[in-house]
């Protein structure tokens, strides 16, 4: 383009308008990011991803958990796993001051080399004297990895999950991390699948492996890839139960209608379990002899289960923490906290996306018509 043309007032005005419009777009994005609503790596912008930092998962994993639980699933059995149980005393303690606080519930699948793959996450903001997590005024949508996890609130505590028709590839250790204000509660659940359930979906552990992060990466970030957004738990329940019925039909083709049995309930012990003394493990890798997963296998067929832990990313420091297995309750429904005898007059929590401050909203509303109109006029006249 000739220099004379580039210097014309129309051309300069066109470039100025385009630059102004670009500045407006960047300003709006900066307002959203500055308000704590950064888009997730999975590009799901209406999820409050990363608002509550997880912290160093290696430290959480190497410390003694508040609850330990062993779960054995037979074939296409379904089970409600609620290791932490009633959280009302924790919520009451954090809310005693009357100050707002945040909370989060995250389940991880833990690989033998101590790599954490999130399978469920939900966050709660603006919690003011809540009786249960759902009383918080702002709640993020449900985020799931795969459709065989369902109904995080069936157990009543708001932190449990239901497992339906897991296959043997998902045998291993699951870690629950619940943060309520300044309080953290953890649980390690060893899931052993006895008997195969038909697979009606893609290779699951491969997907989890591709989306697992090392412990210290969770201190400053969170990987949202591989997780799916469900606006309502009813939508997720419909999808997962349909997949579960398909599995049952494959397992029992002669059945006219695939029945969905009532789930078994697995809950944690009433008191914190005291771990045994740490025992050194002599092994060249992260796997125990005769234990394909390296986690959650019996030590001598009669002793307690164990879990490998690695501290400070030193792969030579592999230790085994053994603990007494809890006594499992009789099969039956998980409790329902909503029927605890109190009335809840709070408004329904809102599922919201990234939050934007009032100043940013006013600025966008005032400047948008002017900038868009100026840009359109200039482009029509000079470009």
UniProtKB/Swiss-Prot annotation:
Q: So which stretches are on the Intravirion side?
A: 380-383
UniProt region (Profusion), positions on chain = 244-311
Q: Which InterPro entries match?
A: Herpes_glycop_dom, Ig-like_dom_sf
Endpoints of the signal sequence: 1-30
| Spans through the membrane | 359-379
Region annotation (Disordered) maps to 315-349
What is this protein identified as?
A: Envelope glycoprotein D
Native source species: Psittacid herpesvirus 1 (isolate Amazon parrot/-/97-0001/1997) (PsHV-1)
């Amino acid at each position: 383009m000739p220099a004379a043309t580039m210097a014309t007032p129309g051309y300069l005005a066109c470039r100025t308008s385009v630059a102004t419009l670009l500045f407006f777009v960047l300003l709006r994005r900066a307002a959203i990011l500055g308000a704590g609503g950064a888009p997730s790596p999975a590009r799901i912008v209406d999820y409050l991803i990363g608002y509550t930092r997880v912290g160093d998962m290696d430290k959480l994993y190497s410390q003694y958990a508040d609850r330990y639980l062993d779960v054995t699933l037979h074939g296409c059995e379904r089970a409600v796993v609620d290791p932490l149980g009633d959280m009302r005393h924790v919520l009451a303690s954090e809310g005693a001051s009357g100050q707002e606080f945040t909370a989060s519930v995250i389940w991880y699948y833990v690989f033998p080399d101590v790599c954490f793959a999130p399978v469920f996450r939900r966050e709660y903001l603006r919690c003011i004297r809540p009786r249960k997590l759902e009383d918080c005024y702002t709640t993020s949508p449900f985020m799931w990895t795969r459709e065989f996890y369902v109904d995080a609130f069936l157990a009543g505590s708001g932190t449990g999950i239901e497992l339906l028709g897991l296959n043997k590839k998902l045998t291993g250790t699951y870690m629950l991390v619940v943060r309520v204000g300044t309080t953290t509660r953890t649980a390690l659940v060893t899931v052993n699948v006895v008997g195969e359930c038909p697979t009606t979906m893609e290779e699951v552990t491969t997907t989890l492996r591709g989306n697992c992060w090392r412990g210290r990466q969770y201190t400053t970030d969170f990987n949202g890839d591989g997780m799916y957004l469900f606006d309502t738990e009813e939508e997720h329940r419909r999808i997962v139960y349909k997949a579960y019925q398909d599995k049952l039909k494959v397992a029992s083709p002669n059945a006219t209608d695939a029945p969905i049995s009532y789930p078994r309930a697995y809950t944690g012990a009433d008191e914190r379990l005291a771990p045994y003394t740490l025992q050194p493990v002599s092994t060249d890798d992260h796997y125990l002899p005769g234990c394909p997963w390296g986690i959650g296998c019996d030590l001598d067929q009669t002793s307690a289960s164990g879990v490998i832990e690695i501290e400070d990313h030193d792969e030579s420091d592999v230790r085994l923490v053994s603990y007494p297995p809890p006594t499992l309750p009789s099969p039956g429904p998980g409790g329902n906290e909503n029927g605890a005898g109190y009335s809840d007059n709070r408004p329904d929590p809102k599922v919201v996306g990234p939050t934007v401050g009032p100043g940013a909203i006013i600025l966008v509303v005032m400047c948008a018509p002017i900038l868009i109109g100026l840009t359109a006029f200039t482009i029509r006249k000079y470009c």
